[in-house]
Amino acid sequence: MTLGIDEAGRGCLAGSLFVAGVACSEKTALEFLKMGLKDSKKLSQKKRFFLEDKIKTHGEVGFFVVKKSAEAIDSLGLGACLKLAIEEILENGCSLANEIKIDGNTAFGLNKRYPNIQTIIKGDETIAQIAMASVLAKAAKDREMLELHALFKEYGWDKNCGYGTKQHIEAIIKLGATPFHRHSFTLKNRILNPKLLEVEQRLV
């Protein structure tokens, strides 16, 4: 049994970070590969939602999804939020797996406590369980940004999913940041202006 871990929303200017863990056998993983599973970035949103449902309802799959808000990222930092989310997944899913595979190049020092952790660069392209985790994380991020888009249509979140596209950055310059923007990120990019109150009033 392998536990795969991946995230979505790491580089966004808005919305939460989602980290997912999926544990299953190689035999079960093969079923999903036959359904067209691959790195979530290479799947359409419709296909991600389809696979998300199949993963969550499969009797032989264990999964856990952790959300860290923009506010948490601003107060703790992105790296700390990633580490905390991975710890939560390991505490909730580690008993299921004899192998733990994390997408990327860092285990955040957790390999001292969990010696069976492997970090794999582009693991979402080569390890089915990481690709499955990638689907759950990205589908959760998609859903969040579609819901937030209904509140703030000018930022194009239904299309850019919170990433810093030209339209998104231009909207921040023109309208200011929303309470769902990561202010530590927008300040770093010098695109935050003092119009926060104006958009906050829409939430009241």
UniProtKB/Swiss-Prot annotation:
Entry EC no(s): 3.1.26.4
Compartment annotation: Cytoplasm
Cofactor annotation remark: Manganese or magnesium. Binds 1 divalent metal ion per monomer in the absence of substrate. May bind a second metal ion after substrate binding.
Highest taxon, organism lineage: Bacteria
GO cellular component labels: cytoplasm; ribonuclease H2 complex
Gene3D superfamilies reported for this sequence: Ribonuclease H-like superfamily/Ribonuclease H
NCBIfam families registered for this protein in UniProt: PRK00015.1-3, PRK14550.1
Family, similarity comment: Belongs to the RNase HII family.
Function as written in the Swiss-Prot or TrEMBL entry: Endonuclease that specifically degrades the RNA of RNA-DNA hybrids.
Protein name: Ribonuclease HII
